């Protein structure tokens, strides 16, 4: 072993195993691209994105940590969301929650 080396287990690693999911259609109605990161509270994303925000409340994208999804102007795509975990408190973003979910 080399100091700092990471030896991953063999096989596939399932992300967010067992987490309940919601799939939503999202459209970028704006004139600029919008990029949403993996742990952003999806209900508070850019107002130019059109989707069921109530269904997205308390949820984030079901994608690997540190990655993002980009919505080009006029583009519609499906995204899968999972519940935010941990203490389930949201602060910042667009300041629509600022506390417990």
UniProtKB/Swiss-Prot annotation:
The gene is ureB. GO terms for cellular component: urease complex. Its EC number is 3.5.1.5. One of its GO terms (biological process) is urea catabolic process. Keywords: Cytoplasm, Hydrolase. Heterotrimer of UreA (gamma), UreB (beta) and UreC (alpha) subunits. Three heterotrimers associate to form the active enzyme. This is Urease subunit beta. It catalyses: urea + 2 H2O + H(+) = hydrogencarbonate + 2 NH4(+). It is found in: Cytoplasm. It comes from Rhizobium etli (strain ATCC 51251 / DSM 11541 / JCM 21823 / NBRC 15573 / CFN 42). Pathway: Nitrogen metabolism; urea degradation; CO(2) and NH(3) from urea (urease route): step 1/1. PANTHER family: UREASE. Belongs to the urease beta subunit family. The keyword Cytoplasm applies. InterPro entries: Urease_beta-like, Urease_betasu_sf, Urease_subunit. One of its GO terms (molecular function) is urease activity.
């Amino acid at each position: 072993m080399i100091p700092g080396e990471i030896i991953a287990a063999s096989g596939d690693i399932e992300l967010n195993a067992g987490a309940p999911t919601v799939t939503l259609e999202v459209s970028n109605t704006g004139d600029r691209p919008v990029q949403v990161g993996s742990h952003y509270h999806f209900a508070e994303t850019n107002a130019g994105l059109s989707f069921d925000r109530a269904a997205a409340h308390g949820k984030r994208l079901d994608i690997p940590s540190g990655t993002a999804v980009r919505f080009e102007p006029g583009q519609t795509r499906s995204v899968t969301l999972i519940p935010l975990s941990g203490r389930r408190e949201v602060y910042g973003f667009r300041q629509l929650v600022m506390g417990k979910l």
